[in-house]
Amino acid sequence: MDNNLEIKDLEKIAKKVRYNIVKMVGLAKSGHPGGSLSATDIIVALYFKLMNYSPDNPYKKDRDRFVLSKGHAAPALYAVLSELGIIEEEELWKLRRLEGKLQGHPSMDTPGVEICTGSLGQGFSAAVGMALGCRLDKLNNYVYVLLGDGECQEGIVWEAAMAAAHYKLDNLIAFIDRNKLQIDGCTEDVMSLGDIKAKFEAFGWDVFEIDGHNFEEIINTVEKAKSMKNGKPKMIIAYTVKGKGVSFMENNVAFHGKAPNEEQLKQALEELSE
């Protein structure tokens, strides 16, 4: 969005986004803070640095599109859209409430949300369809999609991966939020993903591995992916920390889908204010 933003600017935005994630989930007493915090830096880098996207015209036809396939991380997307001015900040504090507009998972009723997601794998499949549609419409844009690593245990992910390679969708850039935890525990204990890099390569994708909290790596890798016009979709495996930024949430599977209590909320907000 803004090529003039520096890494320090993105880090500042990400810290504010994390603060708002924890606050909104805490006030709602419900939600998924862990995976929202691990995904924050990727979403911030896309919207504030990499995507052709204007908050003043969020539905411009040739815009870049972002799909949050791991829809339970909706608080991260909402907080970013709020920083862009697309969602009013006051709406964040009504998350999951009847009087509010923000649901627990992304809904197309929400400004800036491209498609409803939450049923694991379906957002990824929809992103493949979007990329194909943009190609057929001869649009010079990109579709970005963020998956969870536990999400990759779903069969629909691999059907979509096969289709993306078949249709040579090099306008599709996907991320896996590889925090190695899901609701029932470690991904490798629940259903091992094995060598996920080799798997996507076998499906015909170009694959990169990065630190998902390093803005320089995120930006440079996306720019490299965009430069490779070789008919292959791109997968970026981003190694992240679940609950990033809050000491007692980091690598703690309990906070996959649990809100902090009042005492924990106070501590978390203090940490994110430092």
Curated annotation (Swiss-Prot):
Its cofactor is Ca(2+); thiamine diphosphate. Its EC number is 2.2.1.1. One of its GO terms (biological process) is sulfur compound biosynthetic process. It catalyses: D-sedoheptulose 7-phosphate + D-glyceraldehyde 3-phosphate = aldehydo-D-ribose 5-phosphate + D-xylulose 5-phosphate. Transmembrane segments: none annotated. Keywords: Calcium, Metal-binding, Thiamine pyrophosphate, Transferase. Gene3D superfamilies: 3.40.50.970. Binds 1 Ca(2+) ion per subunit. Ca(2+) binds at residues 149, 179. GO terms for molecular function: metal ion binding; transketolase activity. Disulfide bonds: none annotated. It comes from the Archaea. Pfam families: Transketolase_N. CDD domains: TPP_TK. Belongs to the transketolase family. This is Putative transketolase N-terminal section. It comes from Methanocaldococcus jannaschii (strain ATCC 43067 / DSM 2661 / JAL-1 / JCM 10045 / NBRC 100440).
